[in-house]
Amino acid sequence: MPSWQASVLNRLLTYVARPSVSRGSAKVPLSAIRQRLLEMDRRLLGWLPELKVEHWPLSHSPLIHYQLPQPREVSLFYIRGGGFCFKTPHAHARFLADIMRRSLADCYVPDYRLAPEHPFPAACDDVLEAYRMTLEHCDPDKLVLMGDSAGGNLALSLLLQLKQLELPLPRACVLLSPALDLGITGDTERILAADDPLFTVESLLRLRGAYLAGSNPMSERVSPLYGCFKDLPPILLLAGTRELLLQDAERLQQAVLRDGGRIEAGFYLNMPHVFPLFELLPEAMEARGQIAAFIRNNLLL
C-alpha cells in the first residue's frame, strides 16, 4: 500500500506540475520553462553547505565533482535527468548527497548541453568526454554509473558505447525511471491509458522532438533499449508503476535477461517518475537504501 505522502505528492504533481510541462504550456518556449524550473529548484531546495563542489572545464560543458567530508571508498558517475531539455541541480545534489553518505562516495556529474539549443548527439558526446575525464581520477572497478529519466537513457547509451569503444566499464549501473525507447515501439494502449502524475503523452513527444531534431529514433545511441546487453556490469533498475515510461523499464529487464546479463529490478506500486528524488516519501528512502545496498554488494564494501 503506497504511503499517504505518496498520495499527496501524486495529487500535487497532477494538478500543479503536470500542467506546467504539458498541453497547457505547449506555446511556451522550452527555454522559458527551463528558467522557471531552475528558479523553483533554487528557491525551494537551496544548497547543502557541507557539499564541496568543483567545476572542471571540458570542450562544451563542465564536469562537476561533489565531495562530502567523509572517507571515500567508491565513486559515482551520475547523469541527471530532465527530459533532455531541463535540469534541477539542487534537487539532484540533495539526492546525491544522501546516496554519497550511504555509500561513502564522491560523485562526478556531467553538466551536459541541453536541447533544443543542442539536440542529439550533443548530450551523448558531452557525457562520453566527461566519463573519460572521470577515469583519470578514479578506478573503474570502484565506479558506479547512475542516471535517471533522460539521464538513464544517456547512462545506458554510454555503457553500450564504452563496450563498443573497448573503454573501461564501471563496476555497476543504477537506472531510475529511464527513458529508453524514443522510437515509442511499446504497447500503445498501455501508453495512452497510463495515469502518470507528471507527464502527458503530448509533453513527452515535445521533449522527444526537441532532442531528436530529425535524428533516427531507432538508433541504438538514441534508444539504447535496442542494444545488446551481453557482457555489461550488473544493473539495478527502479521505476514507479504509474509512469508513462514503465514499459521501457520492463522491456529493459526482459532484454538484459534475454542476453544473459545481470539485472535487479524494483517496480514500486503507485510511485511517480523518478520517485527516489522526493525525500519526504518513505518509498524514496526505501529505494535509496536499495541503491546503497546494491552498490555495497557489487563493490564488495
Where are the regions that the model predicts?
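A glycine/proline-hinged amphipathic helix-loop "lid/cap" segment
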Residues: 1-68, 301
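Alpha/beta-hydrolase superfamily serine-hydrolase fold, recognizing
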Residues: 16, 20, 60-64, 71-301
